[in-house]
Every structure is written in C-alpha cells, then in structure tokens.
Amino acid sequence: MNLSNWNPYLKLDDYGSTCMAQQTYEPLVSPDEKIFCKNYSFPNNYQYMDTSDRPLYTEDVVDWFFNNEVEYLNKFSEKSYAPEVIDIDFKNRKIYLKWYGNSCNQIINSGQEWPQEQWHQQIKDIILDQYNEGVYKLTMYPHCHYIDNDNNMRSIDWYGCVQVNNPYVEEKYMQGIIHETAQFRLEETGKAIDSVLNIETMFKRSLGEHVLWGNQNMSYIYKEIFNE
C-alpha cells in the first residue's frame, strides 16, 4: 500500500494545538480518513519530529513493541472494543485499521459537544474488562480510543500492555519510548531491578492520577479495581 500521501496523526493538547500522539510508532491516516496505519518500520520521520536526538529509540525497541502490539491485538480481537484490523504486514511492520476520522482526544480537546455520560461508562467497561482478562493496558488516554459509527468505543495502541501476574518490562524498552517530559512517570515505578521495571506501579499511578479525559481522571475506575 502506497502511504506517500497519507497524513500523520497528531493529537490535540489541552490548548487545542497539535502535537505528537506517542513516542513508539508512526501513525498515518489515509486521505479519506477511513484507514489508520500503525507504521512500526524503523526509522520513521514521525518519531523525530520533536528532536533528532533519540539514541535510546532503536530498532530493537520498535520490534519489541510491534510484537507486543500484535500479541495483544490477537488476544482481544473478539472484544467489541477491539479495533477492526484490515491487515497486518509483518514483513514491513505495518498494521492497518478501519478508522472513523477522529480519536476521542480530538473530540474532547476540539470543543465538540460530547456529554460525559457518553464515554464515562464505556472507558470504564473497557479498562475493567482488560483487567479481568489479566492485562494492564497503560495506553488509556483519549488519543488511544475512538468512536465508530455506532457510537461504540474502540481501543488502539495495544503495545502498552503487560500481564497483571507478570507486569515487568526491561527498562531499555520503556526508556526508548518515554518523552523527556514524562520521565518522572518511570521514576515513580522505582529503580529497575536487574534492568527490569515493575509496570504495575506505573499503571496504578496512571489510572489514579495521570490519565485525564477532559478534566476527569480515572480514579473512579482505580477504586473499583484496587479498592483503595
């Protein structure tokens, strides 16, 4: 598939300005906005938009997250909130998904009318179901979700998953995709032990404090999972 005229996906910050959505792959949207491509080829232009100095962002890092994405896409493929996969190009490390024009981030941060009750329960149901399936999905943000034509919320960015009973990731992989402004998030997990980080701590802090949908954090979901 020729991607030369596809557009990079950019999320909106709190002020409505465009910025990079994540530090892992190149997100591309077809001209008709009906296909979303997750391009895990290395290197790619998108991941050097903010800076050309990313020595920890390596092909090994990109490979690891591509494989993790595919693993959890497959695990959750039958869920109503799973993305509709068109194709996975393993040779070129590209994943093609059916797209509906905007992510939840663009709806919320562009000032569109979207009553909280229309997403509040859906994101809760998604996160609780993932937890009940034994998975922590760190990518809980609005730009990691979208609404299809039936007002059903779907989730992307499955690269950010770990097992609840084995929530450990080598530090080099996390350092490879963390933005300098979010370095404190890794520090909250504590020092790496044998070069491995406990991602459960990061998930809990994200869910309880850091992830925002508009001005609403996810603490109401945190309390239901952890009873804290």
Where is each model-derived feature located?
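ATP-binding glycine-rich loop module of kinase domains
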Residues: 8-75
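Protein kinase-like catalytic core scaffold
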Residues: 35, 81, 95, 154-157
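Hydrophobic residue at the +6 position relative to the catalytic HRD Asp in the kinase catalytic loop
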Residues: 143-147
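C-lobe/activation-segment region of protein kinase-like
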Residues: 136-137, 148-228
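Conserved structural core of kinase catalytic domains
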Residues: 60-65, 74-120
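Protein kinase catalytic-loop region centered on the HRD/HxD motif
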Residues: 128-136
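Active-site beta-strand termini and strand-to-loop segments that position acidic
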Residues: 27-33, 98-99, 148-149
